[in-house]
Regions:
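A glycine/serine/threonine-rich, flexible loop-to-helix segment
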Residues: 49, 212-215, 236, 243, ...
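Aromatic pocket-lining residues of Rossmann-like dinucleotide-binding sites
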Residues: 29, 234, 289
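A conserved structural motif in NAD(P)-dependent oxidoreductases
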Residues: 271-282, 293
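Short C-terminal tail/terminal secondary-structure segment
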Residues: 287, 298-315
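Short-chain dehydrogenase/reductase
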Residues: 1-167, 179, 183-184, 227-228, 256, ...
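Catalytic loop of short-chain dehydrogenase/reductase
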Residues: 102-223, 227-236, 248-249
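Conserved SDR Rossmann-fold cofactor-binding beta-strand/turn motif
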Residues: 240-250, 290, 303-305
């Protein structure tokens, strides 16, 4: 008799599962016997990295279905759900729906102000060295892990092309409200288990204004609203909806943010454990939220950051 918490006909459907949090979660849940369906959007050149990861999941003896298609397209969504329904068979059901789509716009909403005199310039003057030389040394040491130097390193560069309403709307849909359409379609087809989980990922950027993050922050706020409403209105269908607020994590999505190197440095300095959150840290908590024992957790935002968000301590 298996001690695993998931039945042989139960599945996890992961939107955005070829890297980062989604892939780590696919690995974690498959380790415990959950069948996996991954929807992702990647170029052909990336598949040489992705396919070995998919093979690792298959090697655990679970079923794996993958769709390299646009999860944001309504018709494509319906096609995938239909194909998955046929694949799962009459007894197959979705235990976990994870929204991990990271497709957003990272433009500023206003122009950058002119450069002003900085602490770096004052320090160079006091030391009697050229500011350019001081900057070179600070940048080199910063890249080597001296996080406390971030205030005197070269500032991040941002595009002069500013965010517009269309950029904002696309990002809010892709990283926020698209969860609703997937949840509704799966529910309408009666594909959820009697004790199902709808999960998503948010970040501290939902309440802190990071430069270039305005559209993603709006999307995360929308995602939080959708998750709360699912928790309240779909509980009668056996659905528990929660979000994980991950700490700063070195993922492909983070690296797309201008100034991400500085964000990582700030997080390491601020975190009580002086390290970044990892995708595995987050996947472990998603697994815990998927267990039967977590059935009374509903409508919550769970911080998974080692205390980063609440820490006022720095080195």
């Amino acid at each position: 008799m298996s001690n695993e918490p998931f039945g042989p006909n139960e599945w996890a459907l992961i939107l955005g599962g070829s890297s980062g949090f989604g892939l780590a979660t696919a690995h974690k849940l498959s380790e415990h016997g959950l069948n996996i369906c991954i929807v992702h959007r990647d170029r052909r050149g990336a598949m040489s990295r992705i396919e070995p990861e998919f093979n690792r999941i298959r090697d655990r003896g679970v079923s794996l279905a993958t769709y390299n298609k646009d999860a944001l397209n309504k018709e494509v969504r319906s096609e995938i759900v239909k194909e998955l329904t046929d694949l799962m068979g009459e007894d197959g059901r979705i235990r976990v729906l994870l929204h991990s789509i990271a497709f957003g716009n990272l433009k500023l909403i206003g122009p950058e102000p002119p450069a002003r005199a900085t602490a770096r310039a004052r320090l160079a003057e006091e030391l009697g060295v050229e500011e350019t030389r001081l900057t070179e040394v600070a940048d080199r040491l910063f890249e080597q892990g001296c996080d406390g130097l971030q205030g005197i390193t070269t500032a991040p560069e941002y595009s002069s092309d500013l965010l517009d309403e269309e950029d904002m709307a696309r990002t809010v849909h892709s990283m926020g409200t698209s969860l609703l359409g997937w949840t509704q379609e799966i529910l309408e087809r009666s594909l959820f288990t009697a004790d199902a989980r709808v999960l998503g990922l948010t970040s501290e950027g939902n309440s802190v204004a990071w430069k270039g993050y305005a559209a993603v922050a709006a999307a995360k706020a929308a995602l939080e609203s959708v998750s709360r409403s699912i928790a309240a209105e779909m509980a009668s269908s056996g659905i528990r909806s929660n979000l994980v607020q991950a700490g700063v994590t070195d993922t492909p999505a983070l690296r797309m943010i201008p100034g991400s190197f500085h964000l990582k440095a700030q997080a390491r300095v601020r975190n009580p454990f002086n390290r970044l959150t990892t995708p595995s840290d987050v996947a472990n908590v998603i697994y815990l939220l998927s267990l039967p024992e977590a059935a009374w957790i509903n409508g919550e935002i769970i911080r998974v950051d080692g205390g980063e968000c609440i820490s006022g301590v720095s080195e």
